[in-house]
Every structure is written in C-alpha cells, then in structure tokens.
C-alpha cells in the first residue's frame, strides 16, 4: 500500500472528512514520526509496534564494480519492531510455506 492509497482508503472510510484534510493528517503524522526519529526519540504505537534507531558500527565494505575495499562509517538506521497483536494478525493471515524458508 502506498501513501496515496492509504489516504484514498481513509478518505473513503471517513466520508465526513475532506480528502484534503485526510491528506494533511497523514502527511503530518509521517512528518512528525520522521522528526521524532531524527531527534533520537522512540515511537511506540500500542498493538502495532515501535520505531527506534539502531546503530550500525563502522565496517569494511566492498565496491561492487572494482572489488576494492571501502571503509564505511557507522550510522543510525530506522528500525521497526512489530507489536504482539500485529505479529499475531500477520501470522494468522499469511500462510508460511516451510519449504520456502528452509535453506
């Protein structure tokens, strides 16, 4: 689902709201979440999950074209941890083929 699809679905479900208002609300929510993460804050949405930053330490990478070793600096990356309710909903809906997950 894309952001545009989310806005469209929400606008249809909440017919009393203008599409522009739904658009503004979704964009504002995402902007606030991005700002909170960039400030180093953790975001927790009960029943859905939490967003936080994880630190990736410096490492030695490789240039895929030349094969040359490249020193990559450490960095913070966004991380999402699904909540228990979301994990249960997904596991009960999406069938897992054990043969596909085995190596």
From Swiss-Prot:
Keyword terms of this UniProt record: DNA recombination, DNA-binding, Transcription, Transcription regulation, Translation regulation
Recorded GO MF terms: DNA binding; structural constituent of chromatin
Top-level taxon of origin: Bacteria
GO terms for biological process, alphabetical: DNA recombination; regulation of DNA-templated transcription; regulation of translation
UniProt-annotated stretches for the region Disordered: 62-81
Coiled coil: none
CDD domains named in the record: IHF_B (cd13836)
Claim: Transcription is one of the keywords in the record: yes
GO cellular component: chromosome; cytosol
Pfam families: Bac_DNA_binding
SUPFAM superfamilies tied to this protein: IHF-like DNA-binding proteins
Subunit-level organization: Heterodimer of an alpha and a beta chain.
Function: This protein is one of the two subunits of integration host factor, a specific DNA-binding protein that functions in genetic recombination as well as in transcriptional and translational control.
Family stated for the protein in its record: Belongs to the bacterial histone-like protein family.
Listed name of the protein: Integration host factor subunit beta
Species annotation: Xanthomonas axonopodis pv. citri (strain 306)
Lineage of producing organism: Bacteria, Pseudomonadati, Pseudomonadota, Gammaproteobacteria, Lysobacterales
């Amino acid at each position: 689902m894309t952001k545009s699809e989310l806005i469209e679905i929400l606008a249809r479900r909440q017919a009393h709201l203008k599409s522009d208002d739904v658009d503004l609300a979704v964009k504002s929510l995402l902007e606030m979440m991005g700002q909170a993460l960039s400030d180093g804050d953790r975001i927790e949405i009960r029943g859905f999950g939490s967003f936080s930053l994880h630190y990736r330490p410096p490492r030695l990478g490789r240039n895929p074209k030349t094969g040359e070793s490249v020193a990559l600096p450490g960095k913070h990356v966004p991380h999402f941890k699904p909540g228990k309710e979301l994990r249960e909903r997904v596991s009960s809906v999406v069938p897992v083929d054990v043969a596909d997950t085995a190596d």
